[in-house]
Every structure is written in structure tokens, then in C-alpha cells.
Amino acid sequence: MASQFASNSLLVLGAYGIIGFLYLVVIPLFLYFWMNIRWNFMNKFERLCLYGLVFLFFPWFDFICSFFKPKNSWARRDLAIDSH
């Protein structure tokens, strides 16, 4: 009886760990890189869906985006051009 409880507990903890890892790491990274690739080519429905997913997976976007900064940002180029 005790070993069955322990094995069930490990299964539940493992399932929570996998779901948490997907929610906090894998899906936000996928969305971030997808948006970097498709940013200038998205239609309005794709953009709306992505914004909804970003809102859903928001907790780690602040953390992840602080490490992955875009290299070719149009906003940065415009600021660099305006400052000269």
C-alpha cells in the first residue's frame, strides 16, 4: 500500500514537473523565436493569436526576453538614425 502511494506520488510530481517545464520554458521560447522570425510577415489573425498566447504564457516572458534581445530591431535602427 505504501509503495503504491509512493509510486503514484512520483507519477504526479513528474507530470507536474513536465507540464511546468513546458509552460515556463519550452512554449515561451518557441513563441519568442516564432515572433522573431515572423514579425514583419504576420497577418492580423496570426498576430492576434500570438498576442493571446503571449498573454497566456506571460510569467516567464520577462525573464526569457531579458536574455534574448533582437539584433536587428527596426526601432533601434530608427532611433540610431534619428540621433545623428
UniProtKB/Swiss-Prot annotation:
Instruction: Kindly state which keywords UniProt assigns to this record, in alphabetical order.
Output: Membrane, NAD, NADP, Plastoquinone, Quinone, Thylakoid, Translocase, Transmembrane, Transmembrane helix, Transport
Record's bilayer topology term: Multi-pass membrane protein
Where located? Cellular thylakoid membrane
Q: Record's Gene Ontology CC terms?
A: plasma membrane-derived thylakoid membrane
Can you tell which superkingdom this protein's organism belongs to? Bacteria
Q: What does this protein do?
A: NDH-1 shuttles electrons from an unknown electron donor, via FMN and iron-sulfur (Fe-S) centers, to quinones in the respiratory and/or the photosynthetic chain. The immediate electron acceptor for the enzyme in this species is believed to be plastoquinone. Couples the redox reaction to proton translocation, and thus conserves the redox energy in a proton gradient. Cyanobacterial NDH-1 also plays a role in inorganic carbon-concentration.
Report the source organism. Answer: Prochlorococcus marinus (strain MIT 9211)
The UniProt catalytic activity note for this protein reads: a plastoquinone + NADH + (n+1) H(+)(in) = a plastoquinol + NAD(+) + n H(+)(out); a plastoquinone + NADPH + (n+1) H(+)(in) = a plastoquinol + NADP(+) + n H(+)(out)
Gene Ontology MF term list: oxidoreductase activity, acting on NAD(P)H, quinone or similar compound as acceptor; quinone binding
Subunit structure and binding partners: NDH-1 can be composed of about 15 different subunits; different subcomplexes with different compositions have been identified which probably have different functions.
EC number in record: 7.1.1.-
Claim: Transport is one of the keywords in the record? yes
Q: Per its record, how is this protein called by name?
A: NAD(P)H-quinone oxidoreductase subunit L
Q: Which family does it belong to?
A: Belongs to the complex I NdhL subunit family.
What transmembrane ranges does the database entry give?
10-30, 48-68
